[in-house]
């Protein structure tokens, strides 16, 4: 076994990748990611001490966010990048340690190897990385809870990173991330670990609320919008991922250049924000969910900007047109450097590249509708409440989450098609691509698929549910006519799940498979306490959700 990773839904055999990631990452990159997380735990140990002593270093929180974000699925495949990050991590960790010593803060009690180990050469990194991975925790249940928490924190870091880019921060979130990381190094009881995992859900709600505030105060509340999925005849740039700050700067820099901009996958949600609608060269959305990019990036013809995950190892036919930025990296791809001294990123190279390219090849035409975030949906609250009271809407189905390659995910398309006509789907994330182009009709003018936006906009779905609970004067969110049938893929879906559990949501169905990182005993706890379940057949599940089983 040259690596071990089981953080995503597509992990080999639903057990773990041991020689190469299904995602495409090599074993050495997987191991270096483990080592980076290990050293970041050491940083966290010292920085919590520094916080207690009133010593503040603003660089630390950003570094931890970046490091965690770089290790999520389909973000960073670069060996060289992780080697550089590990060197920086050791340097930062030791600088915090030195500052503590200088300020006469007692650190003799710190004995953890992750706070003390020093490596200089790549060979030392690789040797150490082989010893600090997931399987270094021998007890299966302890390992399961530690990894569940770690993946939740990774998702949290991604959302905090986007908010940070827009100038929004919450120190309590940063402190929790560090405390949670340190907790994975301590010999805690199972009950204590479960408590921290559930606390992670609380901060998951907080970080999604922070990002929602950042996005809406910066770009306006998402509006119900018809989005063009066809093409024009101009050269263009395709922007993928989730980072709206990158979107803003790209639109500003392409204005007046003759280069159009299209969104891809979860960046579709940018079409819903009022601030972006003023750009005439912002055409619409091209393609589908992330996993189809091998074909769609080729047919797009122009350059592609990957702002965050999900990147698939690119094919030679279009590799020279893919640019990365932020936490994303892949050997051989051009990388656009981060902002410095308060200035915008420089997108001039990708813009000039676009001018030399043919216009996108049409792969579909027409429009799709989205923008049903909490502000837009709550403006329809009276209409929705009336529809529920009259029986026009029998039930809502939250089908947020991720899409992926597995054929078993066709379940979600089939499920959407088979739902009775008096039901409405609430969605967010790229899971929507399984049904957002189906003609499922409407109920009294309310579309039967209400897309709130990106995966973090699952927060909107929670806000909507809580508002409906208030309107209907219910004591418990689970009394609402809402069922949760969520598809997951990576670590941002984990923090969304933990956030829902914190809000008291029960009987969530999770698929297409339950996470490999849930040991039988941990899965049993989630089933018994929260009613977590997997998926069955479409017919059986619909009967179960509608109380007809």
Swiss-Prot record:
One annotated GO molecular function is:
peroxidase activity
Q: What does this protein do?
A: Catalyzes the reduction of hydroxylamine to form NH(3) and H(2)O.
Swiss-Prot/TrEMBL cofactor(s): [4Fe-4S] cluster; hybrid [4Fe-2O-2S] cluster
What is the name of the protein in this document? Hydroxylamine reductase
Q: Which domain of life is it from?
A: Bacteria
Gene3D superfamilies found in the cross-reference section:
1.20.1270.20, 3.40.50.2030
User: Where does the protein end up?
Assistant: Cytoplasm
Q: Give the gene that encodes this protein.
A: hcp
What's its EC? 1.7.99.1
- Binding locations of hybrid [4Fe-2O-2S] cluster: 242, 266, 310, 402, 430, 455, 490, 492
List the PANTHER family hit by this protein, alphabetically: HYDROXYLAMINE REDUCTASE (PTHR30109:SF0)
Do you know which InterPro entries this protein is assigned to? Answer: HCP/CODH, Hydroxylam_reduct, Prismane-like_a/b-sand, Prismane-like_sf, Prismane_a-bundle
Q: Which SUPFAM superfamilies match?
A: Prismane protein-like (SSF56821)
Q: Which family does it belong to?
A: Belongs to the HCP family.
Extract one GO BP annotation from the record: response to hydrogen peroxide
Q: What class of enzyme is it?
A: oxidoreductase
Q: Which organism is it from?
A: Clostridium novyi (strain NT)
| Cofactor binding mode and count | Binds 1 [4Fe-4S] cluster. Binds 1 hybrid [4Fe-2O-2S] cluster.
The residues listed in the UniProt record as binding [4Fe-4S] cluster, with positions renumbered to this chain, are 5, 8, 17, 23
């Amino acid at each position: 076994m040259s690596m071990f990773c089981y953080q995503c839904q597509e992990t080999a055999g639903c057990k773990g990748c041991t020689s190469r990631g299904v995602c495409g990452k090599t074993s050495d990159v997987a191991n270096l990611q483990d080592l980076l997380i290990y050293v970041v735990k050491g940083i966290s140990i010292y920085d919590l001490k520094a916080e207690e002593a009133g010593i503040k270093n603003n660089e630390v929180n950003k570094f931890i966010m970046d490091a965690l974000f770089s290790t999520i699925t389909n973000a960073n495949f670069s060996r060289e990048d992780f080697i550089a990050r590990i060197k920086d991590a050791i340097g930062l960790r030791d600088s915090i340690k030195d500052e503590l010593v200088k300020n006469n803060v007692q650190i003799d009690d710190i004995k953890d190897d992750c706070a003390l180990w020093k490596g200089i050469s790549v060979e030392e990194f690789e040797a150490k990385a082989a010893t600090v991975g997931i399987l270094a925790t021998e007890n299966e249940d302890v390992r399961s809870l530690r990894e569940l928490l770690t993946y939740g924190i990774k998702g949290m870091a991604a959302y905090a990173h986007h908010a940070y880019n827009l100038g929004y921060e919450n120190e309590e979130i940063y402190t929790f991330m560090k405390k949670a990381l340190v907790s994975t190094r301590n010999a805690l009881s199972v009950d204590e670990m479960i408590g921290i995992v559930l606390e992670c859900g609380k901060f998951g709600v907080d970080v999604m609320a922070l990002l929602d505030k950042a996005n809406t105060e910066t770009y306006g509340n998402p509006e119900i919008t018809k989005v063009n999925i066809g093409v024009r005849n101009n050269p263009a740039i395709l922007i993928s991922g989730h980072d709206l700050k990158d979107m803003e700067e790209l639109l500003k820099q392409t204005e007046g250049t003759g280069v159009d901009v299209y969104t891809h996958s979860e960046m579709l949600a940018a079409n819903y924000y009022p601030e972006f609608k003023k750009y005439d060269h912002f055409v619409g959305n091209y393609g589908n969910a992330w996993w189809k990019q091998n074909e769609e990036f080729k047919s797009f013809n122009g350059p592609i900007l990957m702002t965050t995950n999900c990147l698939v190892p690119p094919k030679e036919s279009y590799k020279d047109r893919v640019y990365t930025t932020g936490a994303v990296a892949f050997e051989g791809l051009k990388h656009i450097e981060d902002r410095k001294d308060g200035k915008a990123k420089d997108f001039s190279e990708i813009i000039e590249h676009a001018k030399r390219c043919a216009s996108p090849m049409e792969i579909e035409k027409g429009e799709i509708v989205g923008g049903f975030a909490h502000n837009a949906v709550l403006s329809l609250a009276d209409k929705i409440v009336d529809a529920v009271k009259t029986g026009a809407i029998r039930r809502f189905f939250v089908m947020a989450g991720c899409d992926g390659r597995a054929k078993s995910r066709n379940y979600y398309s089939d499920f959407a098609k088979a739902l009775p006509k008096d039901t409405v789907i609430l969605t967010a994330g790229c899971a929507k691509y399984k049904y957002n182009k189906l003609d499922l009709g409407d109920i009294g003018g309310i579309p039967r698929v209400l897309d709130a936006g990106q995966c973090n906009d699952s927060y909107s779905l929670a806000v909507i549910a809580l508002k409906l609970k208030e309107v209907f004067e219910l004591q418990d969110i689970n009394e609402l006519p809402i069922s949760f049938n969520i598809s997951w893929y990576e670590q941002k879906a984990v923090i969304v799940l933990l956030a829902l559990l914190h809000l008291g949501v029960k009987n969530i169905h999770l698929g297409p498979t339950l996470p490999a990182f849930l040991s039988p005993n941990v899965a049993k706890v989630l089933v018994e306490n929260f009613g977590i379940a997997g998926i069955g057949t479409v017919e059986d599940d619909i009967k179960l959700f509608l109380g007809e089983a």
